[in-house]
Amino acid sequence: MTVKFSQVSYVYQKGTPFEHVALRDIETTFQQGKYYAVIGQTGSGKSTLIQHFNGLLKPSTGKLQIDDITITHKTKDKVLKQIRKRIGVVFQFPESQLFEDSVEREILFGPKNFNMPIDEVKARAYKLLIDFGFSRDILQQSPFQMSGGQMRKIAITSILAMDPDIVILDEPTAGLDPKSRDQIMKMIKKLQVEQNKTIILVTHEMNDVAKYVDEIKIMKQGQLVEECSPRKLFSDTNYVNQLHLDVPDVVKLQRDIEDKYQYYFNKIALTEDEFIDMYKEWQEDER
């Protein structure tokens, strides 16, 4: 499932004194099976961009092409329903949107609205919940008796159980403990690798971007200013600082060691394991 933005702009409250241009002439493509990060400062247009994928917002000008479906400002809601089954969006703090009295009812609410095969949905949901570390009787429990991290996993499961081709996550690990954060990020990566899902991650957490992402799309003041790999972006720490973004911890460590020993590695490490291998190789060469 390929999504192409063609000269997409979006204006909030158009024609009023409060008019605000949130997106300006976005031209980009999201390919099936890749893991993307959409990054930028607060107010750069990230959340507005992702709301166009399933028609929560429609372009003020320009168009989206999602496989054979074209979305413009004139597109009818009945057309959008076709793509909403295939694109799952997990918004910030999704646990705040839970309302059913059992995990099973919560997970099945969306699929029932789309007339999906319930047995298949339950089977997928059950496997996801077990992978997240829940007990086998989880489906009959109330989500409101669980911790914040557990509720977040339930909310994410309710989207993933619908088996979307594209999974969009807006700050999915915000406010979570390290264990829950790690579980969620590993699960999402597993979906990409094993099921060829397209993943679109909106985040300020650059450690996750470095570790999991294939391609970065950088937003600034409603414009897409660059598309690049994590290694290319984080190799230029001055540029990262200019964007007012954090440098991943492993990159900070590498730069500190390079400055201390005046030895410069031939590439930037994106994970701890990668840096350990580079460091060991350097130490062996020094002997």
UniProtKB/Swiss-Prot annotation:
ABC transporter domain ranges (all copies): 3-246
One annotated GO molecular function: ATP hydrolysis activity
Primary location: membrane
Membrane topology value: Peripheral membrane protein
PROSITE patterns referenced in this protein's UniProt entry, alphabetically: ABC_TRANSPORTER_2, CBIO
GO cellular component, one term: ATP-binding cassette (ABC) transporter complex
Keywords: ATP-binding, Cell membrane, Membrane, Nucleotide-binding, Translocase, Transport
Residues the record lists as binding ATP: G40, Q41, T42, G43, S44, G45, K46, S47
Domain of life: Bacteria
Disulphide-bridged cysteine pairs: none
This protein's record includes keyword Transmembrane helix: no
Alphabetized Pfam families for the sequence: ABC_tran (PF00005)
Subcellular localization: Cell membrane
Transmembrane segments: none
Signal peptide: none
EC number: 7.-.-.-
Family: Belongs to the ABC transporter superfamily. Energy-coupling factor EcfA family.
Function: ATP-binding (A) component of a common energy-coupling factor (ECF) ABC-transporter complex. Unlike classic ABC transporters this ECF transporter provides the energy necessary to transport a number of different substrates.
Assembly information from the UniProt record: Forms a stable energy-coupling factor (ECF) transporter complex composed of 2 membrane-embedded substrate-binding proteins (S component), 2 ATP-binding proteins (A component) and 2 transmembrane proteins (T component).
Name of this chain's protein: Energy-coupling factor transporter ATP-binding protein EcfA2
Species per Swiss-Prot/TrEMBL record: Staphylococcus saprophyticus subsp. saprophyticus (strain ATCC 15305 / DSM 20229 / NCIMB 8711 / NCTC 7292 / S-41)
Gene name per UniProt: ecfA2
